[in-house]
UniProtKB/Swiss-Prot annotation:
The lineage of its organism: Bacteria, Pseudomonadati, Pseudomonadota, Betaproteobacteria, Nitrosomonadales. [4Fe-4S] cluster 2 binds at residues 156, 160, 163. It catalyses: N(6)-dimethylallyladenosine(37) in tRNA + (sulfur carrier)-SH + AH2 + 2 S-adenosyl-L-methionine = 2-methylsulfanyl-N(6)-dimethylallyladenosine(37) in tRNA + (sulfur carrier)-H + 5'-deoxyadenosine + L-methionine + A + S-adenosyl-L-homocysteine + 2 H(+). Catalyzes the methylthiolation of N6-(dimethylallyl)adenosine (i(6)A), leading to the formation of 2-methylthio-N6-(dimethylallyl)adenosine (ms(2)i(6)A) at position 37 in tRNAs that read codons beginning with uridine. [4Fe-4S] cluster 1 binds at residues 11, 48, 82. One of its GO terms (molecular function) is 4 iron, 4 sulfur cluster binding. The gene is miaB. This is tRNA-2-methylthio-N(6)-dimethylallyladenosine synthase. The keyword Metal-binding applies. Belongs to the methylthiotransferase family. MiaB subfamily. Residues 377-440 form the TRAM domain. It is found in: Cytoplasm. Residues 142-376 form the Radical SAM core domain. It is an enzyme of class 2 (transferase).
């Protein structure tokens, strides 16, 4: 049986896309996943261009599999994702052993691109932006466990000065409303209990309705909430500018919507937010969070932060630290600023030293880590509804699951609980997870 190896970098959208690549090639050629490139007939790198030196990391990984191509000329090597979208044919020019280069919007054409490569003997490059076409050509998703991702829109039209996403994934394009609802209903009918709605700017969703007009994100959430079998709803990633009052009110009336929100802020300084072209102030962000917690008092908040953005002073950074403490963020994706080619900020003077950037990042992460541990400790003694995702990472005899507020819980229980909800009493708070005991453990083993 032919095998496919996919290495994925970056965001959950890329994780979703990698699953779809595997689905497409399984349907077309019967390829099944392997965890080792040495066993593969097709090797794909699904790349991310958000972080520094992303291109060099891709070529480094390509270099590590070049010998496999030399040993087996029939091996197909492909590069997809955002670096592929940025670099295009330049990838083949630098690494001539690459067979296919494709963007996030053309992954559905993989079987065709591979067939053309075999037929012509020439590398194939397709990094076009055919809007939402790919969703019409994807096979039904595989269901593994009780949770699934559903992509509802692609791209971003915000053009923050530091970000490459609008250039690599294109402008915002929403899937038709009925297509999203049909996919969610199909997943629920196949046993999926938790749905995560995905998009680069997911709350900017404006899906076309069959009867005319559009559905906004709040309406989509309300309709997903009504689908039988769906018991928990998440979404990522959102933008503060699209956090409408209707969406905020969903936290007061949709109990299936989890008590966790990832809402990127990037900085606590109005001056830096303006330089980033974020389109909101610190006060406006704080107002959004206040309104959200009026609707859902136990809402846990995570965010994205960039430290050392061009022009960031000590006062700017202290404003970020103040915001972190005021709003009690308890998780983050936080990074040192690095120039991304083709973005407006790449022309700014990168005037914060590497040493200072590192110091600031360490302070920020330590503060958020302390706040996260405070939340974890506050959960000890409570009973949490946990969706079992698999075996515990460090103990194969235990199960691991996730709470509504996005905490990992490890506890003893039989493997048949995979994909099921279990009530778990939290007994211990660890730095990055919780331990617990299933409330009805005596019945779980029968």
């Amino acid at each position: 049986m032919k095998k496919i190896y996919i290495k994925t970098f970056g965001c959950q959208m890329n994780e979703y896309d990698s699953d779809k690549m595997a689905d497409v090639l399984n349907a077309a050629e019967g390829l099944t996943p392997t965890s080792t490139p040495e066993d593969a007939d097709v090797i794909l790198f699904n790349t991310c261009s958000v972080r520094e030196k992303a291109q060099e990391k891709v070529f480094h990984d390509l270099g590590r599999v070049r010998h496999l191509k030399q040993a087996n000329p029939n091996l197909i090597i492909g590069v997809g994702g955002c670096v592929a979208s940025q670099e295009g044919a330049a990838i083949v020019a630098r690494a001539p052993f690459v067979d296919v280069v494709f963007g996030p919007q053309t992954l559905h054409r993989l079987p065709e691109l591979i067939a053309q490569r075999r037929e012509t003997g020439r590398a194939q490059v397709d990094i076009s932006f055919p809007e939402i076409e790919k969703f019409d050509h994807l096979p039904p998703a595989r269901v593994e466990g009780g949770a699934a991702f559903v992509s509802i829109m692609e791209g971003c039209s915000k053009y923050c000065t530091f970000c490459v996403v609008p250039y690599t994934r294109g402008e915002e394009v929403s899937r038709p409303f009925d297509d999203v609802i049909a996919e969610v209903a199909n997943l629920a009918a196949r046993g999926v209990k938790e749905i995560t709605l995905l998009g680069q700017n997911v709350n900017a969703y404006q899906g076309a309705l069959d009867e005319g007009g559009t559905a906004d994100f709040a309406f989509l959430l309300e309709m997903v909430h009504e689908i039988p079998g769906v018991e928990r709803i998440r979404y990522t990633t959102s933008h503060p500018r699209e956090m409408t009052q209707r969406l905020i009110e969903c936290y007061g009336k949709l109990p299936k919507l989890v008590s966790h929100l990832h809402l990127p802020v990037q900085s606590g300084s109005d001056r830096i937010l303006a330089a980033m072209k974020r389109g909101h102030t610190v006060l406006e962000f704080k107002s959004i969070v206040r309104k959200l917690r009026e609707q859902r008092s136990d809402l846990c908040l995570s965010s994205d932060f960039i430290v050392g953005f061009p022009g960031e002073t000590g006062a700017d950074f202290e404003a970020t630290m103040k915001l972190v403490e005021e709003l009690n963020f308890d998780a983050s994706f936080s990074f040192i600023y690095s120039k991304r080619p083709g973005t407006p900020a790449a022309d700014y003077a990168d005037d914060v030293s590497a040493e200072l950037k590192t110091q600031r990042l360490m302070r920020l992460q330590a503060r958020i880590e302390a706040q996260a541990q405070g939340v974890n400790r506050s959960m000890v003694g409570s009973v949490q509804r946990v969706l079992v995702e698999g075996q515990a990472r460090k103990n194969a005899n235990e199960l691991a699951g996730r709470t509504g507020n996005n905490r990992i819980v490890n506890f003893a229980g039989p493997s048949r609980l995979l994909g099921q909800f279990v009530d778990v009493t939290i007994t211990q708070a660890l730095p990055h997870s919780l331990r617990g005991e299933a409330v009805t453990l005596e019945t779980l083993h029968t």
